């Protein structure tokens, strides 16, 4: 919903109806002006109608404008038939006062909300979090909170990689070395990389790891105790790191949670005659489910060595989400390079009648790149540690706080808190301002800047408003908003776009739409702030009106902060 655009569209639609012109579907009736210096909005509807009716577009535009009688809005015709729309301050203020209050930005409850389970984060137990987990965690958390804001019943599930051969490799190493449990995270982290590397050249060790895996999956008490011990150590470390980014989950389920369902589903699929032998393996054929017009390989249920393929874990997890948790939608916020895998999983869910009416979506995302435009790596070619990335960002933010004369003399504890707020906003906004499916280059100096399209710029603008409102007190709460110039009018128009930005972001599963809106709002507010002398205004009603307008902008920033999970400090 865009309060102003919706009103303008209704006015033009009423004129079209009176003229007996058709209402064209999928044609934008009112759009932002291509020349904001000439008009607030424009309509190209006459051009679209001219094509269908084979009439002169300017004459159509003239007939539309002639039917409109709204003194507070000026409609004029430009060029071959473009309709320019200029709004009076009184009209914009009226729309704002009738439709916008602080409550407008509260979560939008639904009577019978659908249930969405969002699968994001997806780290592997006993492996260090790396930069690859950054996007899934940040995007997934924001989408979860956006869906909650829209009134859906939302569950966030981290879906840990905590089962299969990697666990057997770790257990085999722990037993062989006689390591005493519980292990610290520093003791645990090197075990899997070393064991994995060794298993590729040591057949005896690989056989031992496979044996330990089988024992674990069959419920062996000793292996379950070892697994639970390092699982707990690893998960506590994951929670610690992700909490810095204000990322949390409703469910800490993993592949292990689905273990009991895997064999039952394999048996069921076989009984239905869906599983066929293929080159020593057992598969479900997907030739009738092409991806982008291309035939996809079959879904492997059981490998040639008799082991159940990991894709069946995703099927078993989906079974739990649909049949037990009653999900109406399941979103997978996972690397775009996993598109084929999820196409296969979703296809199997259809073939086996598991899917039902549940809406399945793979919300793929692009890659974080280094300055060389290649996937971000260390100098040695390894994955960049997520904790290292976070630490570098917070350190860089702290340096900015130390260099700022407004904050350099603050108590150390407060400076650290501000640095965390700034650093986390820098990381999150830098990611979320990009379309989800796009790659982006990691540029720390740019991300922590207080200028430009950055998280710190958004925070700085919000803090500026907080300071303004503190200086003003609370006497401005009463009364309607009145607009007096082009700056407050532009800000009021931008405020009215908030709900539309939320709706578009949700429909596209694209937080970048909302992030771009909030950045544009910040630019608009700062333009207003620098050109309108709020605190020295002698007209008390006008001053209070501007303060109320500022408070609404702050409320939008606070709402956005709750959605992407960043904190706005009191000063910076």
Regions found by a protein language model. Give the residues of each.
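Short, charged, solvent-exposed linker or helix-capping segments at domain edges/interfaces
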Residues: 94-99
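Short, basic, low-complexity termini and linkers enriched in Ser/Thr/Gly/Pro
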Residues: 100-111, 478
